Amino acid sequence: MKKIVATGTFDILHPGHIYYLEESKKLGDELWVIVAREKNVVHKPRPIVSEDQRLKMIQSLKCVDHAVLGDQTDMYKPIREIDPAVITIGFNQKWSEEKLRADLAERNICADVVRISEYTGMPFTSSTKIIDEAVRRRTK
Protein backbone atom coordinates (compact mmCIF):
# COMPACT_ATOMS: atom_id res chain seq x y z
CA MET A 1 0.00 0.00 0.00
CA LYS A 2 1.46 3.37 -1.06
CA LYS A 3 1.08 5.91 1.75
CA ILE A 4 0.98 9.63 1.08
CA VAL A 5 1.50 12.29 3.75
CA ALA A 6 0.13 15.82 3.40
CA THR A 7 0.81 18.43 6.05
CA GLY A 8 -0.62 21.81 6.90
CA THR A 9 -2.27 24.13 9.36
CA PHE A 10 -5.70 23.93 7.69
CA ASP A 11 -7.00 27.00 9.50
CA ILE A 12 -10.38 28.04 8.08
CA LEU A 13 -10.85 25.08 5.75
CA HIS A 14 -11.43 26.15 2.13
CA PRO A 15 -11.47 24.77 -1.46
CA GLY A 16 -7.69 25.21 -1.80
CA HIS A 17 -7.18 22.79 1.09
CA ILE A 18 -9.63 20.30 -0.42
CA TYR A 19 -7.84 20.47 -3.77
CA TYR A 20 -4.44 19.95 -2.09
CA LEU A 21 -5.69 16.88 -0.23
CA GLU A 22 -7.57 15.39 -3.20
CA GLU A 23 -4.53 15.83 -5.46
CA SER A 24 -2.32 14.31 -2.77
CA LYS A 25 -4.63 11.29 -2.49
CA LYS A 26 -4.30 10.64 -6.24
CA LEU A 27 -0.60 9.89 -5.73
CA GLY A 28 -1.18 6.75 -3.66
CA ASP A 29 -3.54 4.41 -1.89
CA GLU A 30 -3.77 5.88 1.60
CA LEU A 31 -3.72 9.56 2.54
CA TRP A 32 -2.38 10.54 5.93
CA VAL A 33 -2.69 14.18 6.98
CA ILE A 34 -0.55 15.75 9.68
CA VAL A 35 -2.28 18.82 11.13
CA ALA A 36 0.09 21.44 12.57
CA ARG A 37 0.04 22.06 16.29
CA GLU A 38 -0.83 25.59 17.36
CA LYS A 39 2.52 26.07 19.13
CA ASN A 40 4.42 25.00 16.00
CA VAL A 41 2.81 27.58 13.70
CA VAL A 42 5.48 30.28 13.82
CA HIS A 43 5.81 31.30 10.16
CA LYS A 44 2.43 33.05 10.01
CA PRO A 45 -0.26 34.33 12.41
CA ARG A 46 -1.49 31.80 14.97
CA PRO A 47 -4.47 29.70 13.85
CA ILE A 48 -7.94 31.02 14.61
CA VAL A 49 -9.45 27.54 14.82
CA SER A 50 -8.15 25.21 17.57
CA GLU A 51 -5.95 22.27 16.61
CA ASP A 52 -8.55 19.77 17.83
CA GLN A 53 -11.26 21.37 15.70
CA ARG A 54 -8.96 21.55 12.65
CA LEU A 55 -8.09 17.87 13.13
CA LYS A 56 -11.77 16.91 13.38
CA MET A 57 -12.59 18.78 10.16
CA ILE A 58 -9.73 17.11 8.27
CA GLN A 59 -10.73 13.68 9.61
CA SER A 60 -14.24 14.19 8.22
CA LEU A 61 -13.09 14.66 4.62
CA LYS A 62 -13.82 11.77 2.26
CA CYS A 63 -10.37 11.80 0.66
CA VAL A 64 -8.55 11.53 4.02
CA ASP A 65 -7.88 8.05 5.36
CA HIS A 66 -6.05 9.09 8.55
CA ALA A 67 -5.36 12.44 10.21
CA VAL A 68 -3.17 13.13 13.23
CA LEU A 69 -1.83 16.13 15.06
CA GLY A 70 1.85 16.83 14.52
CA ASP A 71 4.39 16.19 17.24
CA GLN A 72 5.03 19.20 19.47
CA THR A 73 8.82 18.83 19.47
CA ASP A 74 9.87 16.70 16.48
CA MET A 75 8.02 17.36 13.23
CA TYR A 76 9.59 14.28 11.66
CA LYS A 77 8.33 11.85 14.34
CA PRO A 78 4.89 11.20 12.77
CA ILE A 79 6.50 10.94 9.33
CA ARG A 80 8.85 8.22 10.60
CA GLU A 81 5.90 6.42 12.20
CA ILE A 82 3.71 6.61 9.07
CA ASP A 83 6.61 5.73 6.70
CA PRO A 84 5.11 7.30 3.56
CA ALA A 85 6.28 6.82 -0.02
CA VAL A 86 5.45 10.46 -0.83
CA ILE A 87 5.18 13.68 1.15
CA THR A 88 3.20 16.44 -0.53
CA ILE A 89 3.50 20.14 0.12
CA GLY A 90 1.10 22.85 -0.93
CA PHE A 91 1.95 25.46 -3.54
CA ASN A 92 2.25 28.20 -0.91
CA GLN A 93 3.95 26.25 1.85
CA LYS A 94 7.31 27.77 2.71
CA TRP A 95 9.23 24.51 2.27
CA SER A 96 11.98 24.19 -0.28
CA GLU A 97 11.64 20.76 -1.87
CA GLU A 98 15.43 20.39 -1.92
CA LYS A 99 15.81 21.28 1.76
CA LEU A 100 13.00 18.93 2.75
CA ARG A 101 14.56 16.10 0.72
CA ALA A 102 17.91 16.74 2.43
CA ASP A 103 16.29 16.83 5.89
CA LEU A 104 14.50 13.54 5.17
CA ALA A 105 17.68 11.87 3.89
CA GLU A 106 19.59 13.07 6.97
CA ARG A 107 16.99 11.27 9.09
CA ASN A 108 16.98 8.12 6.93
CA ILE A 109 13.42 8.75 5.80
CA CYS A 110 12.96 7.50 2.23
CA ALA A 111 10.07 9.48 0.75
CA ASP A 112 9.65 11.44 -2.44
CA VAL A 113 8.57 15.08 -2.15
CA VAL A 114 5.90 16.49 -4.47
CA ARG A 115 4.64 20.08 -4.53
CA ILE A 116 0.93 20.29 -5.39
CA SER A 117 -0.05 23.11 -7.75
CA GLU A 118 -2.29 26.04 -6.83
CA TYR A 119 -6.05 25.66 -7.11
CA THR A 120 -7.58 28.54 -9.04
CA GLY A 121 -11.13 27.27 -9.55
CA MET A 122 -12.75 29.56 -6.96
CA PRO A 123 -12.05 33.01 -5.53
CA PHE A 124 -11.51 32.14 -1.86
CA THR A 125 -8.72 29.58 -1.87
CA SER A 126 -6.64 30.80 1.04
CA SER A 127 -7.39 31.44 4.70
CA THR A 128 -5.78 34.88 4.41
CA LYS A 129 -8.07 35.86 1.52
CA ILE A 130 -11.11 34.71 3.48
CA ILE A 131 -10.07 36.63 6.61
CA ASP A 132 -9.25 39.77 4.60
CA GLU A 133 -12.62 39.66 2.83
CA ALA A 134 -14.50 39.06 6.10
CA VAL A 135 -12.77 42.05 7.69
CA ARG A 136 -13.44 44.20 4.61
CA ARG A 137 -17.14 43.33 4.64
CA ARG A 138 -17.50 43.87 8.40
CA THR A 139 -15.79 47.26 8.34
CA LYS A 140 -17.74 48.79 5.43
Curated annotation (Swiss-Prot):
Q: Which domain of life is it from?
A: Archaea
Q: What class of enzyme is it?
A: transferase
The record's Pfam families line, in alphabetical order, gives: CTP_transf_like
Indicate yes or no for the key word Transmembrane helix: no
A Gene Ontology biological process term: FAD biosynthetic process
Where on this chain does ATP bind?
T9, F10, H14, P15, G16, H17, N92, Y119
In the Enzyme Commission scheme, what number(s) does this protein have? 2.7.7.2
Q: Which reaction does it catalyse?
A: FMN + ATP + H(+) = FAD + diphosphate
Matching SUPFAM superfamilies: Nucleotidylyl transferase
**Among its keywords, does the record have Nucleotide-binding?**
yes
Q: What does the UniProt keyword field contain?
A: ATP-binding, FAD, Flavoprotein, FMN, Nucleotide-binding, Nucleotidyltransferase, Transferase
This protein's pathway: Cofactor biosynthesis; FAD biosynthesis; FAD from FMN: step 1/1
Q: Which PANTHER family match?
A: FAD SYNTHASE (PTHR43793:SF1)
Its biological purpose = Catalyzes the transfer of the AMP portion of ATP to flavin mononucleotide (FMN) to produce flavin adenine dinucleotide (FAD) coenzyme.
Q: Which family does it belong to?
A: Belongs to the archaeal FAD synthase family.
Q: What is this protein called?
A: FAD synthase
